[in-house]
Amino acid sequence: MNRKEKNPAGMILRAERIRQGKGQKEVCYGICVVSYLSKIERGSAEPDMAILKQLFARLGINYETDSAFLTESRKQIDEFFYNLQYGLENETVWKKLAGKWDWLLMSPLTIDIRLVSVIYYSESTWKEVDESFIESLMKKEADGNDIQNFLNENVSTLAQLEDCMDEKQYAYYSLVCSRLTKDPAEKMEWYQKVQHGLQNTLGMRCLISGYYEQAEYDAIHRMENRFVTAALEEGNVYALVDYYFMNGSAYACVDMDEMMTVYYERTRRLLQNTGWWKEYEQGLYYNMGATYLAVGRYEEALDCLNRVRSEDFLLCHKKAWLHLLLGNTREADHYLAIMKQLLSRKDMKGKMAERLMYEELCMEQKQDFTADPAYLDLIERLIRALIKEKSFGFLYQYKNCLLYTSDAADDLTRVD
């Protein structure tokens, strides 16, 4: 995609016109012809200042051109993207930029501030974000607002400004789009665009996420030399840690416990003296516990799972399963009861995979459960749900159950 810098005034006109839901004819009536406004917005015409002022006035735009203000804001925006690449805290710099929101929207930095805002708030699905800015917008908007509405509105505006973006801006726009879509193939297309535009470890991490989601684990393994070299050249410990964690997780998904342990140990050692340990600790111990459970290293599995502090559904599932295998009926019943309670919550409504995972464990409490035709039916429904709702790692953990039911089905066929 060939991208070049556009006239900032044209970008402002176009962005604000779109935001207000106005057509070109409505904006330029009595000032200039539609074709001239179109050229201004596309950056293909150098606008007459007298006409530009009239167009700005019609849209209520106070165009920000103060050099000191723009220089300071540019530095803060660059700091935000630097922090994003190196895994550093961004709330402080976001608050500084959010305080200048209205002025930055009407400045040559309009695309950048929208990108910063949607990147920041698209992270709300996995971590806490500052909502005071959104709350302040709610007071201004008659119909109210929330994070999702904010994201939808600004991503829609950015989509209209794609041809005004340079390579890096388009890469960051692609990053947001990858976070907002649920389709794996579409995600991968966006991830590839991120890497094409950034050509750094942040882009490579996006590619790795795509490979992980599509269970292309070999592709993650093959990236090791290239990724480690890039991370060392950047001096980026966070990226290096993230690669080792993802590579270890890829091995965990196929129960390769020895290779998983190698990469998770590298992750732990790199993190042990940093502030990032808490970010990775729980996922690391959960994955290790689940993998040790799958390969029959039960005591090590119990040790790892006991280090996970939150009692969410998946942790309770692994603990209940583990205690059933260890013959600890009372402990298994305890975690099954928690799972049943969690399934009654509103946020679990419609999660068929979780419901069937619970039912499968309940059936495992019965003697000779694999010989029960009802268990075969349950496993078939569970596998369909996992394929539809979960990643390959979830499916792989039931490989032994599939073998049991396959043998049982063969026995039933021979009896018939």
Locate predicted features.
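A short, Lys/Arg-rich alpha-helix, primarily the initiator
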Residues: 1-19
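The alpha-helix within a helix-turn-helix
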Residues: 17, 28, 56
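Short alpha-helical DNA-recognition segment
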Residues: 20-39
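DNA major-groove recognition helix of helix-turn-helix/homeodomain DNA-binding modules
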Residues: 48-66
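TPR-adjacent "capping" and linker segments in tetratricopeptide-repeat scaffold/adaptor proteins
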Residues: 65-74
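Helix-turn-helix/homeodomain-like alpha-helical modules used for DNA recognition
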Residues: 74-124
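Extended amphipathic alpha-helical coiled-coil/heptad-repeat regions
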Residues: 132-382, 391-395, 399-402
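Conserved small/polar residues in nucleotide/adenosyl-binding loops
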Residues: 404-413
